[in-house]
Amino acid sequence: MKTDTPSLETPQAARLRRRQLIRQLLERDKTPLAILFMAAVVGTLVGLAAVAFDKGVAWLQNQRMGALVHTADNYPLLLTVAFLCSAVLAMFGYFLVRKYAPEAGGSGIPEIEGALEDQRPVRWWRVLPVKFFGGLGTLGGGMVLGREGPTVQIGGNIGRMVLDVFRLKGDEARHTLLATGAAAGLAAAFNAPLAGILFIIEEMRPQFRYTLISIKAVFIGVIMSTIMYRIFNHEVALIDVGKLSDAPLNTLWLYLILGIIFGIFGPIFNKWVLGMQDLLHRVHGGNITKWVLMGGAIGGLCGLLGFVAPATSGGGFNLIPIATAGNFSMGMLVFIFVARVITTLLCFSSGAPGGIFAPMLALGTVLGTAFGMVAVELFPQYHLEAGTFAIAGMGALLAASIRAPLTGIILVLEMTDNYQLILPMIITGLGATLLAQFTGGKPLYSAILARTLAKQEAEQLARSKAASARENT
């Protein structure tokens, strides 16, 4: 009997171990329903906020254009009104940010990344109103900014607000709802749910804690925010460029060359952004009055450009279909590209509340169209369509600048509904990303966050030294 005991106990022990393993797996997949419910609440609120923000920007832009119509007979007065309307709106946005919530300036995405790393505070009670109304001022004034920055930061702050209001405890709940709000914000800004999910997983991969709980919550939040957007808008593609032809296999090497061009330009563009930040900081020196006046001058310039050369101002969504259709000459494309590079640098680097996704999409479209027009002339045997290079270029600058090729590709596909171009877009985006990484370029948002944290550390050190000096006296 003693010799039989081990042979009888071994299967029993194995069965117990299997049962215990299955029990552990099932328990691990038990997501707290409270977090999932809160994720749905966050997604709904973020979607409504994004819709309100979008409608508010459109209303302000229409009012500004209406004011210009009333002065159309007097050209000098028309230019003056164009400058002043945009300048006043921009100054309003700059003043709110500098006076009440400096962390609401710029894109806001680095702030969310810092919060996910527990290195930046989330003061939703002041960021939400300042980012919302400040962004209305700058974007409504026609500045070259995108709405995705405000909606992502607003979304993350709404996630933290819901956490505090419902008094949920734990780091996992805080981190999950913050990420859920950010993803929902991007999805609602572009009517691109899959891009919102990928944005959190790819762009915020160093900060995002990938767990069963967090990914389920992000999915739910993105679904709800997209539903809210489509209830108040439409279910079609955000940018209507029509159905473009597919790229033949023997032309794919051209898209790799286009990716190389963006891989060179992306890191250079990032350096220009950071350099312009330093230059403009030397101009205002941290003084609120100088900062607001400088912002008004930049906003007024965008207002003038919006009247004289509309393609060079605004976020760029109106420009993309026109450029993709080939309605600009090569000389005009070069002018638009150079002008928009300058205005993007001025607007974004000045600390205005607004994003850079949309301006970069427009820049990528213009450069891609120009490349496509050259390719059409050089290789007539391929029967190329310049618009396909425009679509490929849209996401390539994002890929090279913020180092998120998947997000850029899926975002453009969802916005334009040209899924047949996924292969050339992958080639262009991957080429741009690899070359940008090979040349040592730093991702834009990571570089901005590093600057913010260095400034925060310097301020804390200065306060500590001042406190020590007071104690010694």
Swiss-Prot record:
Name the intramembrane ranges: 109-116, 177-189, 193-201, 387-401, 402-404, 405-416, 417-421
- Quote the InterPro entries the UniProt record gives: Cl-channel_ClcA, Cl-channel_core, ClC
Annotated positions for site Mediates proton transfer from the protein to the inner aqueous phase: 203
Query: Where is it mainly found?
Result: membrane
What domain of life does the native source organism fall in? Bacteria
What topology in the membrane does the UniProt record assign?
Answer: Multi-pass membrane protein
Q: Which residues cross the membrane?
A: 33-69, 77-100, 124-141, 148-166, 215-232, 253-281, 288-309, 330-349, 355-376, 422-438
Q: Which residues lie on this side of the membrane: Periplasmic?
A: 70-76, 233-252, 310-329, 377-386
Motif Selectivity filter part_2 positions after renumbering to this chain: 146-150
- The residues listed in the UniProt record as binding chloride, with positions renumbered to this chain, are 107, 356-357, 445
Motif stretch (Selectivity filter part_1)? 106-110
Could you tell me where this protein is found in the cell? Answer: Cell inner membrane
**What are the disulphide bonds in this sequence?**
none
Per the UniProt record, the site (Mediates proton transfer from the outer aqueous phase to the interior of the protein) maps to 148
The catalytic activity, as recorded, is: 2 chloride(in) + H(+)(out) = 2 chloride(out) + H(+)(in)
* Residue span of motif Selectivity filter part_3: 355-359
Q: Which residues lie on this side of the membrane: Cytoplasmic?
A: 1-32, 117-123, 167-176, 202-214, 282-287, 439-473
Q: Which keywords fit this entry according to its UniProt record?
A: Antiport, Cell inner membrane, Cell membrane, Chloride, Ion transport, Membrane, Transmembrane, Transmembrane helix, Transport
Recorded GO molecular functions are:
antiporter activity; voltage-gated chloride channel activity
Give the UniProt entry's GO cellular component terms: plasma membrane
Q: Which PANTHER family match?
A: CHLORIDE CHANNEL PROTEIN
Q: What does this protein do?
A: Proton-coupled chloride transporter. Functions as antiport system and exchanges two chloride ions for 1 proton. Probably acts as an electrical shunt for an outwardly-directed proton pump that is linked to amino acid decarboxylation, as part of the extreme acid resistance (XAR) response.
Annotated family: Belongs to the chloride channel (TC 2.A.49) family. ClcA subfamily.
Q: How does it assemble?
A: Homodimer.
In Swiss-Prot or TrEMBL terms, this protein is called H(+)/Cl(-) exchange transporter ClcA
Q: Which species does the entry assign this protein to?
A: Escherichia coli O1:K1 / APEC
